[in-house]
């Protein structure tokens, strides 16, 4: 039996992963953005190992989330599932960051740095990361004209690079990125063509399976098959530049 923390587990793929893991007998620590969203998890929460509440767009609340998770105890796996898509405006988090960058990239970066090293790390990427450029100028969209699709693609490229950088820097902690496909969740929309019932299975497999493939590190996965991510994400120099930029924006180093 494993203990797993899943961000964004109030709905969509995070909720599906939580249900599957709890059904299989694992201890799952749930996460919801607000008390209102947490209240919808009453039935599942009663069978979970706890529920942590906090907005991943706020660095203060991210730190609180990390503290609560650490108080529960060391995790066997952390699934960085939470994300936002097609945000119509840049937004402005309490720290002044673009909302998409804050939730999709800065939050998992900070949680990776602040939560005690788990036995496994899983980061939910997207095939759209391949459409992002590899420039790290103005990643927070301070000067550029806002483009929701580009911002999302870039945030997932940085996240993929983060996953592979952690795999390289922390060899004792298997770290992998997952493309769940375009699935009909609240974020993906009702017209998404992929199968919702399959979208969470790779990350749950990576979190708990003793299969030799699931114990490997530095992979980019889609439906339990390793694929090639964008070339930039594989390059150690780019990975290190991403970590440096994220460290600069958050004041926290990995």
Functional labels for PLM-detected ranges:
Residues 4-9, 31:
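Conserved N-terminal Rossmann-fold NAD(P)-binding element of oxidoreductases
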Residues 10-12, 16-18:
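N-terminal Rossmann NAD(P)H-binding glycine-rich loop of SDR-like oxidoreductase domains
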Residues 24-39:
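Conserved glycine-rich Rossmann-like NAD(P)H-binding loop of the short-chain dehydrogenase/reductase
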Residues 45-60:
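Rossmann-fold cofactor-recognition segment
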Residues 67, 89, 93-102:
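Active-site Tyr-X3-Lys motif and surrounding loop/helix of classical short-chain dehydrogenase/reductase
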Residues 83-89, 98, 120-172, 179-192:
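Catalytic loop of short-chain dehydrogenase/reductase
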Residues 177, 193-244:
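C-terminal helical subdomain
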């Amino acid at each position: 039996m494993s203990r797993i923390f899943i961000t964004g587990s109030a709905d969509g793929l995070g909720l599906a992963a939580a249900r599957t893991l709890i059904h299989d007998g694992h201890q799952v620590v749930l996460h919801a953005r607000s008390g209102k969203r947490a209240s919808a998890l009453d039935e599942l929460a009663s069978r979970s190992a706890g529920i942590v509440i906090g907005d991943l767009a706020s660095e203060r609340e991210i730190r609180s989330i990390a503290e609560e998770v650490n108080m529960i105890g060391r995790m066997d796996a952390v699934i960085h599932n939470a994300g936002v898509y097609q945000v119509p405006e840049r937004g402005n988090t309490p720290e002044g960051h673009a909302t998409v960058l804050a939730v999709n990239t800065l939050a998992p970066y900070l949680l990776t740095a602040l939560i005690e090293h788990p036995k496994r790390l899983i980061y939910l990427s997207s095939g759209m990361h391949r459409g992002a450029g590899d420039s790290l100028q103005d990643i927070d969209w301070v000067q550029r004209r806002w483009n929701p699709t580009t911002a999302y693609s870039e945030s997932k490229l940085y996240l993929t690079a983060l996953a592979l950088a952690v795999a390289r820097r922390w060899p004792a902690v298997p770290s992998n990125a997952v493309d769940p496909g375009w699935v009909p969740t609240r974020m993906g929309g009702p017209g998404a063509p992929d199968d919702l019932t399959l979208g969470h299975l790779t990350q749950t497999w990576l979190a708990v399976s003793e299969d030799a493939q699931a114990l490997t590190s530095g992979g980019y996965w889609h439906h339990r098959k390793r694929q090639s991510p964008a070339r930039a994400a594989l390059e150690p120099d780019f990975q290190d530049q991403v970590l440096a930029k994220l460290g600069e924006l958050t004041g926290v180093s990995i």
